Amino acid sequence: MGPSLFADMAATINATLQSETANSYVTLAEANTYFETVPSSTQWDNKTDDAKNRALISATRWIDTLNFYGDRCDADQALSWPRNNYHVDRVELACSAIPNDIKYATYELANALANDTDSITGTTGDTGLYESVKLGEMEVKYNTSSQATGTVNNVFDVYPWLQSYLGAYCLGGSGSYQVRMVRG
């Protein structure tokens, strides 16, 4: 089998507000400027621009899994932000900007993901967290023979510090997931 057609394609950021094709809340230039002001900048600086772009896109995707207060400014916009019809600290959200806390969360999560690409999804393998969980006659068993990538229900589970940036904007989580339950 030959090389992938996409192997040499660089990730491209589209951070245009309300765009139908936006894939990031911030540009690479904004992220680089942010990391000039933080102590851990070398963890970001030592990455290629392509790795940084991929991390910013991935961070945005994970942030977009959360449920936010307010409404999208445009029904056709690709991302959850910008939003309106909600106040944070008596300041109304505006369609003309993404709040700084959303941007800070994107920068910090991108940095974390760039330095640990498997942190949220887990690694491929045949082990799970639990063989089984039993409560009376009810028992939950995880399929430990699966070679599928692991999953985490909520980005806050892995990076609880994100709540300090996003908590005022979030309804409380990214939703639920299904678990197969078997009676013993």
Residue ranges and their predicted role:
Residues 2-184:
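Divalent metal-cofactor coordination and adjacent catalytic microenvironments
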